[in-house]
Amino acid sequence: GLYLVSGNHSAVPEGVGSLQPPVWGLDSLLPAMPDPQGHAVGIEAPGGWICRISPDGKDWTMVASGFRNSVDLAINREGELFTFDSDLEFDVGSPWYRPTRVNHVTSASEFGWRAGSAKWPEYFADSNGAVVDIGPGSPTGISFGHHSNFPDRFQDKLFICDWTFGTIYTVDMEESGSSYVGTKREFLNGTPLNISAMRF
């Protein structure tokens, strides 16, 4: 099938099936504080989402949600899906700031992005955590190296692009339970080096 990734401002189209139960109520104990800059005020769950689409385009199924603004996907040799999700620059310095991060997109996963202070912390049992936090930036392209012409040591690395700081990182991943933990390393940077996409 095909995959479509969409940011937090994109509504889920009508008729889309879901692997998740649609229980996206903002049912926090304390009321959420909206973004003081007005970003995403009134935008409610599920936030950004990923759908699997049949080759004929007729059947859409949401496989994961709770993203801020992922713009690309990568699939490893085992067929597992990953994305590089955005932060919200207005949140830097707030207790609910969530850095850009690499996510392992498992079936029916929820990553807990909500507007303002309502983001789910990683310790919530039903919120998937990140493989690795990257920090402030603007995620764009993401690709595994197994179709590149790089030397063998790069073939299984995940390459991620940051437009803001003109940086390409590599991420090494180790299995951790049913997911992964990662370590980032700067691969290339420059000024300007505004990378918007990457494919090998």
Regions found by a protein language model. Give the residues of each.
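Beta-propeller domains with acidic blade repeats across secreted/periplasmic ectodomains
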Residues: 1-200
